[in-house]
Structures are given as structure tokens and as C-alpha cells.
Amino acid sequence: MAALTRNPQFQKLLEWHRANSANLKLRELFEADPERFNNFSLNLNTNHGHILVDYSKNLVNKEVMQMLVELAKSRGVEAARDNMFSGSKINYTENRAVLHVALRNRSNTPIKVDGKDVMPEVNRVLDKMKSFCQRVRSGDWKGYTGKSITDIINIGIGGSDLGPLMVTEALKPYSKGGPRVWFVSNIDGTHIAKTLASLSPETSLFIIASKTFTTQETITNAETAKEWFLEAAKDPSAVAKHFVALSTNTAKVKEFGIDPQNMFEFWDWVGGRYSLWSAIGLSIALHVGFDHFEQLLSGAHWMDQHFLKTPLEKNAPVLLALLGIWYINCYGCETHALLPYDQYMHRFAAYFQQGDMESNGKYITKSGARVDHQTGPIVWGEPGTNGQHAFYQLIHQGTKMIPCDFLIPVQTQHPIRKGLHHKILLANFLAQTEALMKGKLPEEARKELQAAGKSPEDLEKLLPHKVFEGNRPTNSIVFTKLTPFILGALIAMYEHKIFVQGIMWDINSFDQWGVELGKQLAKKIEPELEGSSAVTSHDSSTNGLISFIKQQRDTKLE
């Protein structure tokens, strides 16, 4: 595929942007079109609640949206989408299919890889997860002293950690009757030491999540957990009752002491950051119950079908992707904020920080050439209203344009004080997107200062600081309630958004070679940290850092 910058549709879009973008004033666009909200929003009825995607507060008009959709068609988005769903090996650097959609394929229609339907295997693992969850949650699964399991500790990193952590936090209200769940990812010993300190070996079950069962951080933490466990249990055969594996490497799992019967497999067509739908989601199913895990899968499947079958101009993941292309490749925006107004979604932005940045943080195209345009944005965010008192200042009055997605449920899980808290939360959510769109004109600020009784001199000094330019773009994503089904749909919506942008940029969204170099060098450096002899094999900075660490290692502090 030709580079994006040489695509005639993109050149047309860029020309239009250069000539007309200065005239896209959101206040004026809303005043000129009373139907703007209806024309630039989607109301998705999932039959398990609604998801409203309001993109009317973006710097677009019908002409821009039409050009963006034409651009998507010219970049082959529809064919690429169909290739993914049909099991083609679209992860071309690793020669793999990309089939997280098969993991949640509730219709059970065949999906083939190399001519073989993967659905029987997917369903076999789901059935195994279901019976395991029932045994643990009912108390039938006993530890080495005959006690039931009260705590699940998921040991993994990256995709084996961020997804299950985000989802178990988001679905806490659905965890009644389930074991508590803990996540250990960091190689920093503090993480596992602090976690184990509050647990009892007799009632703890460890999930070791590693596809290869060789991930350094995960296996080091797993060995530490096993040591801690055996200090109490004494008998190595007890490991089988307290450790299960999510892996594809039976030999390594067995060597660790885990019964292969307690190994839940997944496949090379499941990427780590798209794996919470697979056996990697075992901690989710244990915590909230398998029925709720199935609802999560069903919500994602609903969004998969919407993405697969809906024309591009009414397709939520596609529209979100195209708006991102508009801001990144025409306006030069470098970041994207995800701002969920729901405390249960407090890890949502962190999850999609990996989802987006590990997928589209690439500068090499399918042909092996370097791109001559921007690709994936820096993704970040915090829950509202906390963010309002932290970084929104820069979004409102800073020098950078930061497109934002605001997300909120209409119904709260905790309608305390007759819904007062949630009413205030909703009011803040609505106020922020309106404020970012409208801003505050000098004459509006002047009236406020006069009403506050400011002297003419003070008024003139303060006035420039009280003006808001506005015209800051946002999407509002409003859903009935944060249920397992709706959460599944929201996650899938963003997954497909990321996929569409990768196709537009002609990069592989499903490998992550950028993770490898640091890991290779760390293996080389680790033995050099032994002893006290000087190291000279690196650049002067790295050598100097190693020397400082060696000097300070045994320093006694008062």
C-alpha cells in the first residue's frame, strides 16, 4: 500500500484542512445546525443497555466526515476487517492470525485458521474454566489443609496482568460470593512481598499467566510465591492444589510442579494485550463468576458484529478511529485522553495505554519503509472528577490540543444519598465537554468580573486569564450502566478503533518488537551487577550508572 501521505484521499483531506480548518468554530457549528447532535452521534441499542457515542463536539462537519470515510475505504479498512475475522494471518511479522474475536464468538459460527475451525478448542477451554470456577467458588476445591480458597493471586505482566486487573476492578459490584483477587506484575520485590504479607498459604491459589512460561518477571515472581508457599506447606506435592497455569508450554508447567490438568491453554493467534477474553481472564471469571465472564464476552461479541456489519459512516469504532486520524495527521495532535467518570473504571486508561501504544507505537510500514507521518498517540487519563483538579487546566488553557473521550454510566452502582453523588458527577461530566467546546468569550468574562465588583483596573489585569478559547474537541460516550456486557462492548469498541488506525497507517498493530531490545540488554547487564569490579563494556553513562549502584549498594544509612 502507498504511504498515507501519498494517498489522494488523504491529500484532499489535508488540503481541505489547510484551507478551512481555521473556520471550524464549534460554537458557530452548533448555532448553525440545530440538528448537529442528531447528525453527529450514534445511539447503539445492545438489548442489554444503550451506548451513546456523541461526536458532535469535534472539529468536523459533514464534508470532513465524508472525506474521512472515503479515506478509510481507500486504505482498505473493510477488506482488512474481513481478513481479521476470517482468520487470515494479518500479523505478518510473526505469520499469525489475529483472532481475539474468536474467543468471544458467542454465535459459534466456524472461524478457521489454516483450514481448521478454532471454535471447538475455544469452547473446550471455556468449559474447563467454567467447571474450575464452580469448584473454587463453591468451596469444593480444597487447599492442602482441607480449607477452601479465599484469595486468588494472578502473577503475570503486560497483557497477562493489565486486562484482568482492569476488568476485575471495573466489575467489583459483581464479585459477591467470589474469592478476593490480587495482581502481582512488577519484578520489584516490593510488589510480591507486600501482597504475600497479607495472605495465608492455606487459602491462596496462584494463577501463573505466561504463554511461554519463560517471562522473566512472571517466573521470578512465581518461584518466589512457590518458596513462600512451601515454607508453610513443606510438601512439594501440595503445589498442585495451590498453583494453576495459563500457558502453552506443558513441559515448563510440569517442571514447575503444576499438574498439566490445571493448565489452561490459549493459542498463538491471541496477542497478549487482546487476551483477557481467553484463559488469561481466569482471574476475572473466578472473581465475578463465570456467568458474568460470559456476559463480558457477549458484550464484546455484540460490538464485533456491529464493527463487522455496520456501514463505515455509522460504525462506532471506525468513526472514533477516523476522528483520531484527523487530529493526529492533520492537526498534529500527539496525545489522546481517556477520562472515565466512574471510579470502577480507574484502570481503563492504563489498560488502553498498553492497548493503543503497544499496538500502534510503530514507525515501520508493511513494506518495511519508515513512515513520514505520525502514528499512534500517547494515551493517558484518570477518572473524573479527580482529573479536573489535576491536569484539566492544561486541556482548557494550555497550548496543546488534546482530544478527549469522556465516558460515564447514566446509572450508578451506588445511588447513595438519593443519587446525590452521581447527580454531581453527571453535572461535572456534562459541564466539562460543554466548557471545552464553548470556552468563555472576553465579553462573558468581563460581565462576570463586573458582577464580582472588580475595579476597572483589576478587571483589565484579570480579564485575559479568565478567557477560555474553547474549540477543544471531545467525544462523549454515555452508557446505561457499567455491567459486564456493556464493559465488554466498550473494550471491543476501543480494540477495533486501534485496529482501524493501524490499517490506515499501514503498520502491524499486533506485534511488539519494541519490547525486546531492553529485555535483551537487561540479560547482559544482570551478571555485570555482581561483585565490585568496574564495568567498562558500555557507554560512559551506563558504565557510570553501574559503578554508582555498586558503590551505594552496601552503604549504611543512619
From Swiss-Prot:
Modified residues (N6-succinyllysine): 454
Binding positions (D-glucose 6-phosphate): 159-160, 210-215, 354, 358, 389, 519
UniProt-listed Pfam families: PGI
Pathway annotation: Carbohydrate degradation; glycolysis; D-glyceraldehyde 3-phosphate and glycerone phosphate from D-glucose: step 2/4
Chain positions found as N6-acetyllysine: 12, 142, 454
Molecular-function annotations in GO: carbohydrate derivative binding; cytokine activity; glucose-6-phosphate isomerase activity; growth factor activity; monosaccharide binding; ubiquitin protein ligase binding
Disulfide linkage: none
Keyword Cytoplasm carried by entry: yes
Modified residues (Phosphoserine): 86, 107, 185, 455
Localisation per UniProt entry: Cytoplasm; Secreted
GO CC annotations, alphabetized: ciliary membrane; cytosol; extracellular space; myelin sheath; plasma membrane
NCBIfam families: PRK00179.1
Record family assignment: Belongs to the GPI family.
PANTHER family: GLUCOSE-6-PHOSPHATE ISOMERASE (PTHR11469:SF1)
Protein name as annotated: Glucose-6-phosphate isomerase
Gene this protein is translated from: Gpi
